[in-house]
Amino acid sequence: MTDKIYPILPLRDVVVFPHVIVPLFIGREKSIAALDAAMNGSQELLLVPQRDPAVVEPTLADLHEIGSLGRIVQMAKLSDGTVKALVEGLYRVHLEALNDDEKMFSAKKRNMLEKNSTKSEEHDSIVEILIEEFAKYLRNQERSADELLETLRGINDIGRISDTIAAHMDFRIEERVHLLAMEDAYERSQRLMILLAQESEKNELNKKIKNRVKQQMERNQREYYLNEKIKAIQKELGEMDEAQNDIELLEAQIKKAKMPVDVEKKALSELNKLKQMSAMSSEANVIRNYLEWLIDYPWAIEKPARYDLEEAARILDRDHYGLEDVKERILEYLAVQKRINEHNQKEAGTIGKGPIICLIGPPGVGKTSLGKSIAEATGRDFDRIALGGLHDEAEIRGHRRTYIGALPGKIVQKLCKLGSNNPVILLDEIDKIGHDHHGDPAAALLEVLDPAQNHTFNDHYLETDIDLSNVLFIATANTLNISEPLLDRMEVIRLPGYTTQEKIQIAKRYIVPRQRKENVLKASEFKIKNGVLNDVIEDYTREAGVRNLEREIGKLARKSVRRLQEGKQKSILITPNNLKDFLGVAKYHRNDEDLQAKIGSVTGLAWTSVGGELLQIEGVAFSGKGRLTHTGQLGDVMQESIRTALSVVRSYLDDLDDNFRFDEYDIHLHLPEGATPKDGPSAGIAMATALLSALSKQAVRGDLAMTGEITLHGKVLAIGGLKEKLLAAQRGRLKMVLIPEDNLKDLDEIPEEVKAALEIVPVSHIHEVFDHAFVADHAPFKARIEQKSLPTVSAVMHETPAGRC
């Protein structure tokens, strides 16, 4: 900061940038006094924008703390007492020690350091883009500034170019002050590019609107002239209006469509309106489209549905391997529907309220194909509606007819397309519905998926109730991240991931034959040796489903086709030895070092939208002051779990060793893959084990994984997603998994193959976790642990249900 005091010239609606000369008209007394003071001195003054341009008599609080040091180039007093001045901005300044002596404002300045973080290789490109976008802006504004553009092309300083352009733009005062406050020329140029792009987009939109309005006016005048001319010709010739034939056809179709009485009445009313209109008018087209949608809707067209349970079981077994629990639940559902149909509840005056199925599981486990199989088993039509990213309620309920280009909702559109009112409609990715100011599609689906209400579903476009109770809706999702009211209307059926042996059988029975067919390969031309599929699964996919497995087998088939076409071989045999030649280097390595015992390294288990995953937890302890650091993009619940685990371990170590000083150590806990968000409480025992290992310098078994929520007293609580987590442990070639004792009941759902591959140990307390986690070489340490027990508290506390990690 300099000691020199400069007069302040408050500016309204003007920001003076460095290296830019700006004309100013000054009429306020304090402003004129500031000009006079500058002229009597060094001709320099502080050019400071006001926070609110509407303030006529500003105070110091009304001024920004950022401005420009300016130099008066020229000044002239006008006859009305005002002053015209030409000022040049010199450089950015920060105001210090502001003062108001009633005559004028004054302040000291601190020069703002001009920085430039632009990479040298980007410099020329940024300059070119800035000038090009500015030229485009000037053209849109119909302003001629060839001389200014030539001047800019002669400047090689990004900061100066940005300031010059900003000075000639019509930005809001806040944006200009923001640009003035930015010391880094590179950041200033990036912000300016965004503002220029926004201005260009706004100008283009204005042009489109003007052109559209102009064209509409011309079109309306032309239509009016032609309609009047046609009427005159028809009157002279006495011919019938050609549109009459279309109206008669529409009337016949309305009567043939077997609409409900109230709907047919409304359709005929709209038809009468159409008769009174010119066929060329825009409103006539709106009514005609509306009537066509009413006619196309299958009001009374119901495809005969069959409920042959044996045939349904055959189709499900044909199309899907495994998933026995899922198939059984689907057959139960079809049996109930068959019984409802046999008792003909609708004719008895009641409505069958069969549940809506929601298939939940990771990608590639067969949710969509199960929907197709159900449709085939029941003899119904099938279609799917992709809900992922849907954010407009009108996509479900339809648009009001008053909107240009209005259409019915997706459900009505699908029913019109299929031509029957009892199809199977798959609502795909229901957990990925969005919502914004257009409404909430999930709320609109509440009526669609409620069997007690969907017989009177109202589509905004059709403006009438339609019966959706005959439609069999099946929803799919990767997670239970669905609104509670919507989830309450559906029965959830989980599709867990496949075991390795199940994937091998799926590949042999479905994927390999399908890839042979798609790539026109004979069985004798394309063979896969035993063991190859296992290598593909272990080294190239590692997923809960089989989607990537199909991609890799497809890659094998395509490369085989190429070799056959080149004439190098007459048949291709894929073996473990030549697999790398077809698929390249393995994406996942089976490294025995990962299974070695390490200090502070523990393998947890996570349950995600794509199935189970291994969760690596690393901890280190070093000299410090008892501070805890955790990294890896952890959610709030997981951070609380870490703090709980730390309290358990501190209590444990205090009880184990009275001389242990926790405040002499700092601890850093890290979960790798920091770009991936992680949350949930079920890694609690893994966190505690990692912390104890880091503090005690004792190694943890590398072939062991664990999952379970921990309480402050060391109790291990139940978790969710056990099957998915055990499948992940099997894929990771681990030998032992510690699970909460309360989850023992869930082992009945675990495939025998998984239980045979893993030693699954139930634990109820952190003592038991430590007993199994630390390697046998540290038996003395384990013995000391066994002799101690955590202090207990007599009060009984209710624990919340475990979440999932």
Curated annotation (Swiss-Prot):
SUPFAM superfamilies in the cross-refs: P-loop containing nucleoside triphosphate hydrolases, PUA domain-like, Ribosomal protein S5 domain 2-like
Gene Ontology CC: cytoplasm
Active-site residues (renumbered): 682, 725
Induction summary: By heat shock.
Cellular location(s): Cytoplasm
Annotated binding of ATP, by residue: 361-368
Keyword Lipid biosynthesis among UniProt keywords: no
Reactions catalysed, as given in the entry: Hydrolysis of proteins in presence of ATP
Leading EC class: hydrolase
Alphabetical list of InterPro entries matching this protein: AAA+_ATPase, ATPase_AAA_core, Lon_bac, Lon_bac/euk-typ, Lon_lid, Lon_proteolytic, Lon_Prtase, Lon_prtase_N
Assigned protein family: Belongs to the peptidase S16 family.
Subunit organization: Homohexamer. Organized in a ring with a central cavity.
Protein name: Lon protease
Gene name of this polypeptide: lon
